[in-house]
Amino acid sequence: MSFTVVIPARYQSTRLPGKPLADIGGKPMVQWVYEQASKAGADLVIVATDDQRIVDAVKAFGGEVCLTRDDHESGTERLAEVVEKYQLADDHIVVNVQGDEPLIPDTIIRQVADNLANNNAPMATLGVEIDHEDEVFNPNAVKVVLDKDGYAMYFSRASIPWDRDNYAKSPKEIHHNLLRHVGIYAYRAGFINTYINWEPSALEKVEALEQLRVLWYGEKIHVAVAIDAPPAGVDTPEDLEKVRALIG
């Protein structure tokens, strides 16, 4: 199976400026992500950025990098520019790996590509079972509910499905399987352009979840349970220190 990995990387970050270039064990964060993606069996791994500092850093470690426009409103728009510049065929699989996940397992990068290849949906992603009570009502832990064939019915920051009777008795306990969404996506390249030309939906604005646009317009997203649970990404200086400690 042929697929390409694109790693959108922005220098500006409200909570951690310069995040892609943050040093972890002597290497910039974006290099850790690139190296993990390179193990997944992709034809090509590309860092997509609008910042020359990131371009220089990627070239310094021998990576492929695409300098994009600086007016994109989302990582998906940046992805579309890469698809156009590299003239990827409409049916080619593109995996979007976030640039702030230096410990992402290469196995799940391959898994999400395989997931899309084996389904008719234009888009695929992954989830993991929630095993900690703190995540149940944490709005940053996005939940997803699936139909019988593994297609997403809805994504929400709320606890879904709502177990009415059990939550009434023990509101802080996990009574049934809940699935937390993992923010890695595979797309068919042609669908990316379709997606970015849709107007943002009311639901995605309410939940602040871009993937809800796909469901709003009647398309499907297939969701598989990740074979390896990915560690949390890096959003804050505290997250960065945790990753540095893990790598040693």
UniProtKB/Swiss-Prot annotation:
Sorted alphabetically, the Gene Ontology BP terms of this entry are:
CMP-keto-3-deoxy-D-manno-octulosonic acid biosynthetic process; lipopolysaccharide biosynthetic process
According to its record, what are the GO cellular component terms? cytosol
Arranged from A to Z, the UniProt key words for this protein are: Cytoplasm, Lipopolysaccharide biosynthesis, Nucleotidyltransferase, Transferase
For this protein, the parts annotated as crossing the membrane are none
Subcellular compartments: Cytoplasm
What is this protein identified as? 3-deoxy-manno-octulosonate cytidylyltransferase
Protein source organism? Photobacterium profundum (strain SS9)
* Entry keyword annotation includes Lipid biosynthesis: no
Q: Sorted alphabetically, which HAMAP family does this protein's record hold?
A: KdsB (MF_00057)
The task this protein performs is described as: Activates KDO (a required 8-carbon sugar) for incorporation into bacterial lipopolysaccharide in Gram-negative bacteria.
The biological pathway it contributes to is: Nucleotide-sugar biosynthesis; CMP-3-deoxy-D-manno-octulosonate biosynthesis; CMP-3-deoxy-D-manno-octulosonate from 3-deoxy-D-manno-octulosonate and CTP: step 1/1; Bacterial outer membrane biogenesis; lipopolysaccharide biosynthesis
Q: Which reaction does it catalyse?
A: 3-deoxy-alpha-D-manno-oct-2-ulosonate + CTP = CMP-3-deoxy-beta-D-manno-octulosonate + diphosphate
User: What would you give as a GO molecular function for this chain, any one?
Assistant: 3-deoxy-manno-octulosonate cytidylyltransferase activity
At the top level of its lineage, which domain of life is listed? Bacteria
NCBIfam families from the xrefs?
kdsB (TIGR00466), PRK05450.1-3 (NF003950), PRK05450.1-5 (NF003952), PRK13368.1 (NF009905)
The cross-references to SUPFAM superfamilies, in alphabetical order and at most eight, read: Nucleotide-diphospho-sugar transferases
Give its E.C. classification number: 2.7.7.38
The UniProt entry's sequence similarity note says: Belongs to the KdsB family.
